[in-house]
């Protein structure tokens, strides 16, 4: 009996004894927007951390659809994420509400991030007081993607270049454009249109203009909201409709010819259209627009060592390039690998690489068709024209000497990508000067949101809702009247 009791005790103690020999594995918990990372880098980070620190770690990776859903999850306090990736305005809101940790620059560091992040973006963060709380991940602009030939056909021109937000209101383009179903993006555009006369009095290349556009897109007094509301109703009456994500394909199929777009989505559509032989372009209109960014922040209680090390890992130029190739958006990271990627996508190297691919195809299968393809590639390489673009503002201090032209960073870009993919991803300083960062609307958030709800509700919807309410009310009154009549009759019968 004692022997059986001893065996039972040993069996019960076995898991405890085994666990004593196991290392406790730390886990980094990451909360990111959907489709916003090459998930292969998560496994790579585990290996990177082990090689650097000799410690095995694990990860949990969750995604969210919107900034608001992310915020609500963090606000409950029931989660313990080490990193999340909100957009600029949400970062500001979370900092203001004390929902994020400051980076620890003493015990840990963000050296790799600071070494490789674009100086333009580092300066932007410093100016706005975000450096201690957030690390820039992806960035871009808000502008218009359009089909020049479709628009040109409506104004009897051979070509058409969109230069103003006012094109949303052109009678010739009625029913040809779509607007994002996004209150902040729509507000930005309408506010610029409302204040176009004020903006036109200032030189768009001046520092004063940058200050003014920043102010204009963030004006949310009751009077400003009313003016923006009226302008949005005017826009809505002339466009095809509102969209969340469908316009990326609709502009390729010809359902629309112009759309309010984030630069990353615009590149996707331009690439997709190119495969179908359709030319699309992207522009930030002359009046200006919005420069946006998404960044990593640490919610309260985060493991700062794991979080900051992950940011450093993502800031390695080769990892940033891998991410860009996967998701299509523009990384905040500069460095040699990003320069090479730009050249491979849009520069002389892109055409040389295409010739090499055609040559390899012909060598493997020497058909007439493949020979014609090779000849066309060689002819294009010989005839292609290029523009030298100064990207010093983005790359300064992040490149090896071999990439420098004196003290400048010059990239040679195939002209077919100018006004299209390349300038969509890397706008020049003149464009950025007429772009502002949108702020959190703070106490006016609910007012602006209600305004947008009202704008989206068309007259037919309002009439339908009012009619439905009236019908339900009438039905309830009839039921109550019927019941009252029934009981009245019953009382009369009982008296008899």
Where are these regions (language model features)?
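C-terminal motif of bacterial Sec signal peptides marking the signal peptidase cleavage site
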Residues: 16-19
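Early extracytoplasmic/lumenal segment of secretory-pathway proteins
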Residues: 23-97, 113, 460-464
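Extracytoplasmic ligand-binding site segments that recognize negatively charged/polar headgroups
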Residues: 32-40, 87, 95-255, 269
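Extracytoplasmic/periplasmic substrate-binding proteins
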Residues: 237-301, 343, 350
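Mature extracytoplasmic/periplasmic domains
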Residues: 294-426, 492
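Juxtamembrane/start-of-transmembrane alpha-helix segments at the extracytoplasmic/lumenal side
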Residues: 454-472
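Alpha-helical transmembrane segments
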Residues: 472-486
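Cytoplasmic C-terminal tails of single-pass
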Residues: 487-496
């Amino acid at each position: 009996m004692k022997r059986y009791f001893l065996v039972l005790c040993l069996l019960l103690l076995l898991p405890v004894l085994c666990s004593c020999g196991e290392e406790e594995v730390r886990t980094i918990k990451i909360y990111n927007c959907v489709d916003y990372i090459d998930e292969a880098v998560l496994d790579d980070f585990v290996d990177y951390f082990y090689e650097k620190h000799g410690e095995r770690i694990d990860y949990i990776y969750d995604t969210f659809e919107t900034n608001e859903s992310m915020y609500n999850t963090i606000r409950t306090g029931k989660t313990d994420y080490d990193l999340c990736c909100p957009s600029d305005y949400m970062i500001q809101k979370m900092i203001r509400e004390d929902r994020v940790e400051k980076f620890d620059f003493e015990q840990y560091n963000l050296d790799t991030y600071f070494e490789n992040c674009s100086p333009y973006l580092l300066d932007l963060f410093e100016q706005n007081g975000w450096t201690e709380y957030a690390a820039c991940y992806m960035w871009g602009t808000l502008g218009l993607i359009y089909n020049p030939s479709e628009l040109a056909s409506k104004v009897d021109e051979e070509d058409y270049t969109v230069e103003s937000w006012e094109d949303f209101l052109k009678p010739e383009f009625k029913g040809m454009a779509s607007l994002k179903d996004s209150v902040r993006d729509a507000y930005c555009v309408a506010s610029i249109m409302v204040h176009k006369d004020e903006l036109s009095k200032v030189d768009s290349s001046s520092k004063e203009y940058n200050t003014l556009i920043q102010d204009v897109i963030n004006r949310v007094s009751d009077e400003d909201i009313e003016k923006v509301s009226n302008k949005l109703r005017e826009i809505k009456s002339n466009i095809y409709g509102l969209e969340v994500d469908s316009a990326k394909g609709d502009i390729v199929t010809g359902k629309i010819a112009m759309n309010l777009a984030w630069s990353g989505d615009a590149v996707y559509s331009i690439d997709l259209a190119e495969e179908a032989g359709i030319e699309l372009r992207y522009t930030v209109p002359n009046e200006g627009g919005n420069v946006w960014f998404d960044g990593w922040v640490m919610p309260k209680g985060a493991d700062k060592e794991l979080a900051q090390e992950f940011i450093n890992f993502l800031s390695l130029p080769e990892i940033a390039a891998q991410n860009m190739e996967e998701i299509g958006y523009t990384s905040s990271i500069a460095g040699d690998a990003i320069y090479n990627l730009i050249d491979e996508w849009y520069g002389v190297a892109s055409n040389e690489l295409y010739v090499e691919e055609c040559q390899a195809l012909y060598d493997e299968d020497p058909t007439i068709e493949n020979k014609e393809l090779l000849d066309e590639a060689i002819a294009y390489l010989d005839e292609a024209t290029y523009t030298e673009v100064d990207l010093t503002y983005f790359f300064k201090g992040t490149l090896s000497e071999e990439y420098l032209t004196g003290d400048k960073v010059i990239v040679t870009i195939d002209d077919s990508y100018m006004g299209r993919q390349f300038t969509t991803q890397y706008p020049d300083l003149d464009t950025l000067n007429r772009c502002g960062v949108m702020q959190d609307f703070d106490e006016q958030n609910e007012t602006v949101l209600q305004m947008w709800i009202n704008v989206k509700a068309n007259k037919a919807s309002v009439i339908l809702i009012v009619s439905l309410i009236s019908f339900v009310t009438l039905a309830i009154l009839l039921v109550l009247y019927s019941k009252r009549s029934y009981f009245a009759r019953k009382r009369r019968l009982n008296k008899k």
